[in-house]
């Protein structure tokens, strides 16, 4: 009995030790599983935090050099369809985060607005995901909002024109290219508001005149992106165009009212007796032409600039000069800036304003696209000399000119014609603001 009892007791002890070992193993496995889960959750959290930290939208508009959006939680919304309401705008932008405030400023053709988020990440996500989104068939523009004091006033600086910019060059790229000059204060690429594409030129501002002159000499012919750039002093018209673009892209809010000092300055400066200030002057004088340059060749060179509709081209081959008339003053001013110094047949041409303004009532009809310098092999049933793109462009220009002519005819007197010309050149505009309820600080919002 004693032997049997001892064996039974030993078996119980062994079973107890086995259960303890199993419990210890289960406990160790549970602890290991918990540690693994904690590690994985920590890694995921760290990865998520890193991803959110690295999330940064690409700048798509006129932000000031060195702008730091690290504390910004407000975005500007441009090119908003007139049918869009504030409630619809809030609904769209809440896809990126909780919206604190939304304000929509209505315009006849396209409105604009402002969206304030409770945190910066939501604002950054809105710029990344909503810029270019179509609402009511119209692509909106979304960018950071920032204090006006962050952009330096360059009205008294020295401005240079930079042409032949490739399509991928934006403000930040242009500024970085010229930032090697210590007095470089600003850089702007001019954009077409209808197409959203670069116009192929821009302006760079300098505090020091000597550095601006050095930049013109040293940077001309340098590669920026995929093209070699051309630099020159900005003419008065181009400087005003830059100021006008600043005014168009910016709304300065001061105690609930918009201020636009640059607009007033451009209206009051200068006399209309000078060609550069006379909206009726639309003709470009072209000098230093080789005697072999004829009307078609001159037309082709200015047509390739792509600055506007050409209505007349005249050449005095024996005297080495000619004239190119555009549909409006702004197009002619841009052509002077872009074509001056252009090498034609081995000679740099000289461009300036024609002496005589275009008489009121002059027929406004764009010339057909010029023939190419080579002649394609004739094919039956195919129009010769022009590409399909040329024909479409010509038809579009012709339609726009006819519409513009009808609008001008509806005006009364010369004042109406001048006003229509100014509007066609895009040199006048009115802008409104809205009161910033959260801060008395001036705010500036850029496209």
UniProtKB/Swiss-Prot annotation:
Descriptive protein name: RNA-binding protein 208
The subunit structure is:
Interacts with RBP-P.
Q: Which keywords does this chain's UniProt record carry?
A: Repeat, RNA-binding
Organism, as annotated: Oryza sativa subsp. japonica (Rice)
Q: CDD domains under this entry?
A: RRM2_PUB1
Q: Where is this region: Disordered?
A: 254-279, 353-372
Spell out the InterPro entries in the cross-references: Nucleotide-bd_a/b_plait_sf, RBD_domain_sf, RBM42_RBP45_47-like, RRM_dom
Q: Which residues form a coiled coil?
A: none
What region holds the RRM domain?
Answer: 73-147, 158-236, 282-356
A Pfam family (short name) is: RRM_1
Superkingdom field? Eukaryota
Q: Does the keyword Cell division apply?
A: no
Role played? RNA-binding protein.
The terms under GO molecular function for this entry are: mRNA binding
According to the UniProt entry, which residue ranges have a biased composition of type Polar residues?
Answer: 254-269
